Curated annotation (Swiss-Prot):
Transmembrane segments: 31-53, 68-88, 106-127, 148-170, 193-215, 401-421, 436-455
Membrane topology reported for the UniProt record: Multi-pass membrane protein
Biased composition (Pro residues): 274-285
Composition bias type Polar residues, residue spans: 293-303
Single biological process term from Gene Ontology: adenylate cyclase-inhibiting G protein-coupled acetylcholine receptor signaling pathway
Family to which this protein belongs: Belongs to the G-protein coupled receptor 1 family. Muscarinic acetylcholine receptor subfamily. CHRM4 sub-subfamily.
UniProt cross-references to PANTHER family, sorted A to Z: 5-HYDROXYTRYPTAMINE RECEPTOR (PTHR24247), MUSCARINIC ACETYLCHOLINE RECEPTOR M4 (PTHR24247:SF180)
Organism: Rattus norvegicus (Rat)
A Pfam entry, by short name: 7tm_1
Disulfide bridge partners, by residue number: C104-C184
Cross-referenced SMART domains: 7TM_GPCR_Srsx
Stretches assigned to the Cytoplasmic side: 54-67, 128-147, 216-400, 456-478
UniProt protein name: Muscarinic acetylcholine receptor M4
The protein's role, per its UniProt record: The muscarinic acetylcholine receptor mediates various cellular responses, including inhibition of adenylate cyclase, breakdown of phosphoinositides and modulation of potassium channels through the action of G proteins. Primary transducing effect is inhibition of adenylate cyclase.
Amino acid sequence: MXNFTPVNGSSANQSVRLVTAAHNHLETVEMVFIATVTGSLSLVTVVGNILVMLSIKVNRQLQTVNNYFLFSLGCADLIIGAFSMNLYTLYIIKGYWPLGAVVCDLWLALDYVVSNASVMNLLIISFDRYFCVTKPLTYPARRTTKMAGLMIAAAWVLSFVLWAPAILFWQFVVGKRTVPDNQCFIQFLSNPAVTFGTAIAAFYLPVVIMTVLYIHISLASRSRVHKHRPEGPKEKKAKTLAFLKSPLMKPSIKKPPPGGASREELRNGKLEEAPPPALPPPPRPVPDKDTSNESSSGSATQNTKERPPTELSTAEATTPALPAPTLQPRTLNPASKWSKIQIVTKQTGNECVTAIEIVPATPAGMRPAANVARKFASIARNQVRKKRQMAARERKVTRTIFAILLAFILTWTPYNVMVLVNTFCQSCIPERVWSIGYWLCYVNSTINPACYALCNATFKKTFRHLLLCQYRNIGTAR
């Protein structure tokens, strides 16, 4: 991916003169080496980005809004690998521009438009991810395929409007062409200050914005992953499995139910048989407050009554946290043919402790009750699995964005630092250093597909299936 041709403005003119002067010193072996290396990089870039685009096209698992932005970035990288790399290699090897003014202007326009579109795609990816993690309730509703297409189109159209007319028609605006026929640079970038201004707008400012956004993305993503992380063994052990603490609900006074009925409880997604509690009656029983909510296939509701776990002094207005009560089993009307799921909320101090009971009407009614309980257990397990999948997606997307931004910064920084230095010292940078720095910008287009594969296992598997012609396995790659 490149954003500047190394031959633009006064710094570009200096580079062109150095290229021309050094050409006579290039030996045949040196030119063959340059052609081999750059040709190989061009081939890898083209193949890699075609794989990216095909993977998103054929694998439905990869057809997400975020990957559509990567598809657009892959298009830009493909153009860089197919055209810009090879034309610049020709310029370096021959030491002059041999293709004339028209091809020169078309190359520069294509190079700048595609490079600017790449930067804007990176900004879109960063902003998209930032809004996803900071506005998870409102932004996803507007994050549609149509919206992604409009944003991608806007990035390309804006890049074209900013660069193509100025590069192609500036000579007609000023009335003459000042670029020699054997050289190729942008005419309106006539001094180092202007070149540095374009570097600020096209590189330094986007890098600052993307870095700040990524810091916020990383912090918000870690917070969400930690929030939805499944409980560990220690956390589960410290928590009473049959009870869930909830805000205090409106109490209602009940009486203790008769004992003797069997009971099942839903605990952490598993159906367990709870033994009948053995709780001796307290010396001075005081009515407890509890709330009972039931649901059953017969739409019946019955009250639940509890035996108080401890006695209260009438002189106390408030009481410290009481021990969690043991729920008493309850019986139903023998004539009822429906089993019920009972949710009992027990007040302990300023909290409520809630448990779920499955109460059979008759032994024959145990089966439907167990089926309902298993359904609830399945729902609980699905929720845990979804939380784990969401955490995995968060990490995967964040890693991919980090890799892309890191590759962009590492490969584009050397050239743009040289642009800054050249503003104050036009003879401080050797010609070969200019060429290497500019080629690093192109190498970014080679690295991006590797970033996708290393950070996303689905991309990696789809790449492998495409390369091995295992087309039947592509749809199952996850």
